[in-house]
Regions:
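Second-shell loop/turn segments in exported
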Residues: 104-108, 146-147, 154-170, 476, ...
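N-terminal Sec-pathway targeting helices
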Residues: 32-53
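Terminal end segments
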Residues: 595-657, 743-888
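Hydrophobic alpha-helical segments
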Residues: 448, 510-616, 670-673, 684-693, ...
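Terminal targeting segments of Actinobacterial cell-envelope proteins
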Residues: 1-39
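Substrate-recognition/specificity elements adjacent to catalytic centers across diverse enzyme folds
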Residues: 24, 51-52, 59-335, 340, ...
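Gly/Pro-rich active-site capping loops and adjacent beta-alpha segments
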Residues: 103-136, 390-438, 555-602, 616, ...
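Glycine- and hydrophobic-rich flexible loops that cap the catalytic core of alpha/beta enzyme folds
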Residues: 355-387, 391-553, 570-571
Length: 888
């Protein structure tokens, strides 16, 4: 049987398989990028490719369809102990049945290599700091490799191999064997189209065998993109450089509004709630805001922004998850929902899969389905027969920047100059010369401000003070220590009850997440896992010592004092109100131990979910799967609720300008794709942020428009003469709140006249709020159009927005309304009948652009719809469209 059986020709788009219909007519405006936007590593592709692609249908068919995998029949896979069955449904999702855990993961490795190997290979090159080996002499790739090598992700992953359990090692090894069985005797062009394209630019070697450490290194990338508050920590210090006033900086980082938006947990539900004294600290030292320190901080910021986004970070990265107990559901059993908000690309982040032991027993306990990462065995989010779990980003403060004084090869500790740790790394560049870099570290961690040379970054002011040495910025991060997160993933897969989840959570060290779970016997719960540093109060601190500002590396009082014990991390089972919502808001109110962070999402999204659930319960209606699906795609804007009353109070004399304002008068605050009011309001918000803050902040700290900025503006509305309303560039005029609001209304009317139409009735949110999925290597603007069109699905106009439950975020600082992050998948699990559960992912199962499963879920996802999620043996068999047998 051929290992390359061609797939059925896709419906809809002839290239991607995506349906041409979209929720909103998409017309993508020009893009402007900023530090937090998703970066793309782009390569130049020779004109030969364009000629070849249009030369004839035969070339296209042979070249692009060659890598499509076999989905039915029989394949011999070396290393298997017995036969393995792989059933695929209409979306191509594999459900794998095996006799042993090793065969199960061996088959998962084989199947994921069939579907997604180039994605796996790209990820391992990124996480190992070897991207230039894959794509060639590209400045972005070299910068990414330099920073990743500075972190030492691969080195930490190798150390992690020594601490994970023997069982985990066996599973990782089996997975690697399955991947390598697929790679054996296949040329690069038979594995993925991307290798053929890259081969026109650089020499493409046979892909290296997969190594178990490649899987562990992927966990470092996951932890990096979900690392917590490092952007806020840097932004505080950078904002001080222009504001020179800690009180004004504090205005930009208000306290979490617990009185408006409930934290995840009520302290009354905790067994032994403890109080913690927050150290607020007095005024900033003189060095903060100095040109020399600003230069070092900006260098660190640039370096960290060079790492390609693999999961998602910046505006919109977060998640929704909630669980409702059986007392409020139609089935009488808990129902759980989860939709992680991450960067969106093609292929998507998640790989759906089912992993089933033919006979579930202590020797083979896996019977689980859900969402995995291509490149790592097991299921990261999903359910087994007894328990479902979802993850959201906690945002705990697990990173600190330390401002170090460096002189020659030493750095200052107290009154002594101690040696820096130094190592040399060699970057291999396909088609180019090797590059050697020097990585220097303090006891806190690698010096990141030296990763990108100042000459390349065009820095005018060196980070230098000749008397005490030069400033440097080191990064301490929990994920740069080896841990057992890999053990936790398999423990989640096997967990049967709340105690099992608590034990698994103790192993899940990075990234710090919120776990909500539900059991088939009727319990619901929340567990906070993660390795969270303990920081001591520094009484005479010149900036807060709670981790919200960069810390003085020379003062040992700022050193971490260990970690919060896992048994002290917040946890609750069966809370009195009968549901739990975890959507990145504060875990506990301020002042309740343990201290996790002050930089939460501000809770507008979580509060809306609570309101919708409370309304159902108060009305006496039972919650079912459809209810949960409807909540997931709710598109009511909390921004509008806060701002529209003030906007309608402004008097606009010009009738033309007032036409936009009139749209807001009868608006229901919904952000549907066809809503003219939603489009106008977004333009007002963009202008309001620009008019209010751009004159006060450095470009790197300009407002993204996320939930923190809504909290900031909500507070500013109460003070019409706050200095932030004034434009510092108009020296002889002092602007106030109402002038800024009026100007934002007028400017938004003019903007949409240019961007859409003179007639407000022609405006539509979906025309400018566009999701344009890009391939990470071949999808960028420097790639020839025919190639981009082949690998990038059609743009889709989207509903929703930032801090909306249907969280299709956009970055106001970029000037564009394009979607920057969103629900990377949606799932709802009914513990009363697992076969009633639903799921969907943003693109599809396959990573092959020519596959009908490359983007066949996109239109369904964009419409806010889902697919049935079969789990029982009978339901999986009934849904099956293809059956593949893997034999020893």
């Amino acid at each position: 049987m051929s290992a390359h059986e061609p797939a059925e020709a896709p419906a809809g788009d002839p290239v991607t398989g995506a349906d041409p219909a979209t929720p909103g007519e998409a017309s993508a405006p020009p893009r402007r990028r900023r530090r937090s936007a998703r970066r793309r590593v782009l390569i130049g592709v020779a004109a030969l490719l364009v000629v070849a692609l249009v030369a004839g249908a035969a070339f296209v068919v042979v070249t692009v369809r060659r890598p499509l995998p076999q989905a039915s029949g029989e394949i011999s896979v070396p290393g298997l102990g017995s036969e393995v069955t792989v059933l695929r449904d209409a979306q191509g999702v594999p459900q794998i049945y095996a006799d042993t855990p090793e065969d199960l993961f061996r088959a998962q490795g084989y199947v994921q290599a069939q579907d997604r190997f180039f994605e796996m290979d790209y990820r391992r090159h990124v996480t190992s700091g070897r991207l230039a080996e894959l794509v060639g002499d590209n400045p972005d790739a070299i910068a990414a490799d330099t920073v990743t090598r500075t972190f030492g992700w691969r080195q930490v992953a190798e150390e992690e191999w020594d601490v994970v359990s023997p069982e985990t090692k066996a599973y990782l090894q089996a997975y690697a064997e399955g991947v390598n069985a697929y790679l054996e005797d296949r040329s690069p062009s038979e594995i993925a189209l991307e290798y053929t394209v890259l081969g026109l630019q650089v020499d493409v070697a046979e892909p290296e065998p997969w190594d178990p450490v490649d899987s562990l290194a992927w966990l470092k990338a996951m932890a990096w993109d979900l690392r917590g508050n490092y952007d806020d920590e840097l932004d505080r210090a950078l904002a001080y450089g222009t504001l020179q006033d800690t009180a004004r900086v504090a205005e930009l980082f208000p306290a979490y509004p617990s009185e408006l938006n409930a934290p995840i947990l009520d302290p009354g539900e905790l067994e032994n709630p403890q109080q913690v004294a927050l150290d607020l600290g007095p005024q900033a030292r003189a060095e903060y805001g100095s040109d020399h320190l600003q230069a070092a901080l900006e260098a660190a910021d640039r370096a960290l922004g060079a790492v390609p986004v693999l999961i998602g970070r910046g505006e919109g990265t977060g998640s929704n998850s909630w669980v409702v107990s059986g007392e409020h559901t139609a089935s009488g059993k808990p129902i759980l929902a989860n939709d992680p908000h991450l960067a969106l690309g093609a292929p998507g982040i998640w790989a759906q899969v089912g992993l089933h032991c033919n006979e579930v027993s202590p020797a083979c306990g896996f019977d689980v389905a859900g969402f995995s990462f291509a490149g790592f065995p097991g299921v990261v989010i999903g359910h087994n027969a007894q328990l479902a779990w979802g993850l959201t980003n906690m945002g705990a403060d697990v990173t600190d920047f330390f401002v170090e004084r460096v002189r020659d090869d030493t750095y200052l500790r107290g009154d002594e100059w101690v040696p820096l740790e130094t190592r040399t790394e060699t970057l291999r560049v396909a088609g180019g010369d090797d590059i050697e870099i020097e990585v220097r570290s303090t006891l806190h961690g690698p010096i990141v401000s030296e990763a990108i040379p100042a000459t390349e970054a065009a820095v005018d002011t060196p980070a230098l003070d000749t008397r005490l040495g030069e400033y440097a910025v080191a990064l301490q991060w929990t994920a740069l220590e080896p841990g057992r997160t890999a053990d936790a993933v398999f423990a989640f897969n096997l967990a049967q009850d709340a105690e099992d989840m608590q034990a698994a959570a103790a192993l899940f060290e990075v990234p710090a997440q919120n776990i909500v779970f539900a059991t088939a016997d009727g319990h619901i719960g929340y567990q906070a896992p993660g390795k969270v540093p303990v920081r001591q109060a520094v009484p005479d601190a010149e900036v807060p010592s709670d981790g919200t500002w960069p810390r003085d590396g020379s003062d040992e009082r700022y050193d971490w004092q260990g970690y919060v014990p896992s048994e002290e991390m917040p946890r609750v089972v069966d809370p009195a109100e009968g549901f739990i919502v975890a959507a990145n808001q504060a875990v506990l109110p301020d002042g309740v131990a343990p201290f996790l962070t002050t930089d939460w999402d501000y809770g507008y999204r979580s509060q809306r979910i609570r309101q919708l659930l409370e309304a159902e319960i108060a009305a006496g209606r039972t919650v079912d799967v459809d209810t949960m699906n409807e909540v997931q795609v709710d598109d009511r804007s909390p921004y509008a609720e806060v701002l529209v009353p003030s906007l309608l109070e402004q008097e606009i004399d010009d009738d033309f300008a007032a036409e936009g304002q009139q749209l807001l008068a009868d608006w229901d605050y919904r952000t549907d794709t066809d809503s003219a009011a939603a489009a106008y309001f977004a333009a007002v918000w963009r202008n309001l942020l620009q008019l209010t803050f751009w004159d006060d902040l450095p470009e790197s700290a300009r407002p993204s428009g996320g939930s923190r900025w809504l909290a900031v503006v909500q507070n500013l509305l109460e003070n019409p003469t706050d200095p932030f309303w004034d434009d510092r560039q108009t020296v002889s005029v002092v602007e106030t709140r109402d002038e800024v609001l009026t100007q934002a209304l007028v400017s938004a009317r003019l903007d949409l006249t240019v961007e859409q139409s003179k007639q407000p009735s022609d405006w539509a949110w979906g025309k400018i709020h566009v999701l344009a999925l890009e391939h990470p290597v071949l999808g960028g603007e420097s790639i020839p159009g025919p190639v981009r069109d082949f690998v990038n699905p059609n743009p889709v106009g989207m509903p929703g927005g930032s801090s909306i439950v249907n969280a299709t975020a956009w970055d106001a600082a970029s000037g564009s309304f394009d979607v920057t992050a969103g629900p990377s998948m949606r799932m709802v699990v009914d513990l009363g009948d697992l076969d009633r559960s639903t799921w969907v992912t943003v693109t599809g199962t396959s990573g092959h652009p020519a596959s009908k499963h490359y983007a066949d879920q996109l239109s369904t996802w964009a419409r806010g719809e889902t697919y049935a999620w079969p789990f029982s043996t009978e339901a999986v068999a009934e849904a099956s469209k293809d059956e593949l047998t893997l034999v020893p």
